Amino acid sequence: MNLKEKTRALFAEIFGYPATHTIQAPGRVNLIGEHTDYNDGFVLPCAIDYQTVISCAPRDDRTVRVIAADYDNQVDEFSLDAPIVTHDSQQWSNYVRGVVKHLQQRNNAFGGVDMVISGNVPQGAGLSSSASLEVAVGTVFQQLYHLPLDGAQIALNGQEAENQFVGCNCGIMDQLISALGKKDHALLIDCRTLGAKAVSMPKGVAVVIINSNFKRTLVGSEYNTHREQCETGARFFQQPALRDVSLEAFNAVASELDPVVAKRVRHVLSENARTVEAASALEKGDLQRMGQLMAESHASMRDDFEITVPQIDTLVDIVKATIGDQGGVRMTGGGFGGCVVALIPEDLVPAVQQAVAQQYEAKTGIKETFYVCKPSQGAGQC
């Protein structure tokens, strides 16, 4: 039974009438462009075929009733006519409530909804299960009540809910790719303008995500420190963001910067250039060049941005040794653990899976989790 069938069956069973719509919003993986988003730079994510699915129907009153199928059918119920506040014990409820509260501030022309939610985006793997939930909930209200909101506005609404209601600082990439993703394509996103260009993925290439299942604590504080170092770099060049600094300008004065700040700046500037070039390499089907750019990205994250860990570097080395120049692999996500992403010809996937299974646990004492994904369509009816 797939997620659509599961949520529709549960909807009829619990609410006693059939759902009118089923909406999905996908998770994502970022192929290249790491820690560039909050520097107003470029990212190149694709939506993946793991998603949040919501079966729903409009109500004729002002009540929102929500069932979380993945949390033992926990229930949340709130009124659109009372101030929406955080739930004291159900964290998942706050993503739903936050999206609805911020939607009210954007366009209040909607009434109550019944919904049943289920998803298969792995949680805590950096594949954006929360953004997928936020975008799915926003799309439910937009579709049921024909709200004049486009994908970018639904994405921004989700980001606001996560930043201001849930209280988690995030860029816009995760919500934007979930809302705007295109089947068989990646999306080159300009994080300053929110402009997005679809980039076709070469045929016969698998998107492989491998979770190292290693996570260092203090990730939040490390993230903030790196962000501050980038802002210090932008101030040095008297620019609003590192997006506005050229590599030439940086190289001319790099020795005058604090050495650590200089390394952080060099990563962001070189990563932005790599990301734009990667989009054109993918478009041309040049997997070899894409692989080189992913390798350079990983080395830059390891040596200049200093956000990789030995477990992640080991995983990258195992995959690289197996695929040679026939694809690419790098750490993806915030850093200090998490996942690697690889672009691999489909016929090489079994060899990569076998090599990782044989070597990673032996070298690190941790068992990996392996996902093979397809670039998928963004949010909408399913």
Swiss-Prot record:
**Coiled-coil zones:** none
Give the binding site residues for substrate: 34-37, 223
* Site feature location: Transition state stabilizer: 28
The Gene Ontology terms for molecular function here are:
ATP binding; galactokinase activity; magnesium ion binding
Residues binding Mg(2+), per UniProt: 130, 162
Residues engaged in binding ATP: 124-130
**Pfam families with a match to the protein in the record:** GalKase_gal_bdg (PF10509), GHMP_kinases_C (PF08544), GHMP_kinases_N (PF00288)
Annotated active site residues, numbered on this chain, are 174
Please state where this protein is localized. Cytoplasm
Protein name per UniProt: Galactokinase
Q: Which organism is it from?
A: Salmonella gallinarum (strain 287/91 / NCTC 13346)
What gene, per UniProt, encodes this protein?
A: galK
